[in-house]
Amino acid sequence: TDLGYDIVQVEDGRVTFEGDALAVCRANVFLRTAERVMIQVGRVKATTYDQLFEAVKALDWQKFIPVDGKFWVKKAGTVKSKLFSPSDIQRIVKKAIVEKLKMEYHESWFAEDGAEYPIRVFFYKDEAIIALDTSGESLHKRGYRKNTSKAPISETLAAALIMLTPWNKDRILVDP
């Protein structure tokens, strides 16, 4: 990639690369075509909510969320899976993480008054990717523009389209 990281996998709407904390920061700042940057905590297979609970509970959440961390399942999506209720998936995943952190931190209750750790769950054909969202708002809303107008496409899509052309930074680009 342009940032110097090796791409591990390319799937529909998702590019996976390995990196450290600095790589996450750099990706959030410099990637022009990404909507968000996430840290994959795990991939789990589940066709029942009990299987989902146990699989999520088995992940190493203590490596990502500190004892005072504020965490919630910001979004759950499901396509062609037996588990089809996003709200139920959100509830089960949150409960499983709480149970895991109770065991790891020897706590019965969490204040959740520290840094925020939004979680996203993507189910496809009974396999879920569980990830921490490091971007917050979509990256096309990075906030460097004070006054914006409605555009027919997002900045990230526009950047991708330009990258497919022979244009380079030494040439003038006009956005009519």
Cite the ranges covered by each PLM segment.
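Short acidic-glycine loop/turn motifs at beta-strand connectors
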Residues: Y124-D126
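SAM-dependent Rossmann-like transferase core, predominantly class I methyltransferases
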Residues: I130-P166
